[in-house]
C-alpha cells in the first residue's frame, strides 16, 4: 500500500517519499543526497526503489540534492521548463541528469487558506 513519508520539511529542506517499500517517487530533494539516502534508510526504504524525483520549484530547500541523487542513482527528474531552466542556471542539475520537461506536471494549491495542502498532478498521456 503506497504511503506518504515526510523525510524533511521546512526552510532547511523539503523532501517527501510517496510509495511503498518496492516503488516510490520523491517530491523535491531539498537536502544533500547523503541526508536523503539516510532518511530513507531510517524508514527502511531503499534509494534504489526511487523511480523519479518531481521538483516543485528551483529553490535550494526543494532542489539541493537533485543533481547528486539523480546522477548517482540514475533517477529521472520531472519538472516544468521554467524550473529546469532555473535549476540549470543555479547548477542544481547538469548534463548527467535525465530530465523530463512537461507542462502537464504541476502543483495545485487549493487556496491561500490551505497553503500547506497541495497535490501533484501528472497527465499520463505523455
Model-flagged regions — what are they?
Residues 81-126:
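Metallo-beta-lactamase
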Residues 3-6, 53-56, 116-121:
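Short, flexible loop segments at the rims of nucleotide/cofactor-binding pockets, characterized by
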Residues 1-43, 126:
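Conserved beta-strand hairpin/beta-sheet module of binuclear metal-dependent hydrolase folds
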Residues 3, 76, 97-99:
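Conserved beta-strand segments of alpha/beta enzyme cores
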Residues 2, 45-48, 112:
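Structured loop/turn residues at beta-strand edges in well-structured enzyme cores
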Residues 34-80:
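Active-site metal-binding motif and surrounding structural segment of the metallo-beta-lactamase
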Residues 18, 28, 57, 77, ...:
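Divalent metal-coordination and catalytic microenvironments
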Residues 12, 32, 59, 83, ...:
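A generic "binding-loop/recognition-motif" signal
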Amino acid at each position: 500500500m503506497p504511503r506518504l513519508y515526510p523525510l524533511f520539511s521546512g526552510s532547511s529542506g523539503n523532501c517527501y517519499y510517496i510509495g511503498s517499500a518496492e516503488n516510490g517517487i520523491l517530491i523535491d530533494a531539498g537536502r544533500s543526497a547523503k541526508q536523503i539516502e539516510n532518511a530513507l534508510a531510517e524508514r527502511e526504504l531503499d534509494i534504489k526503489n526511487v523511480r523519479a524525483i518531481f521538483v516543485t520549484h528551483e529553490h535550494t530547500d526543494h532542489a539541493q540534492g537533485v543533481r547528486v541523487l539523480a546522477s548517482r542513482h540514475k533517477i529521472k527528474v520531472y519538472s516544468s521548463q521554467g524550473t529546469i531552466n532555473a535549476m540549470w542556471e543555479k547548477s542544481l542539475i547538469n548534463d548527467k541528469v535525465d530530465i523530463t520537461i512537461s507542462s502537464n506536471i504541476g502543483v495545485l494549491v487549493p487556496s491561500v487558506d490551505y497553503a500547506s495542502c497541495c497535490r501533484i498532478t501528472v497527465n499520463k498521456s505523455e
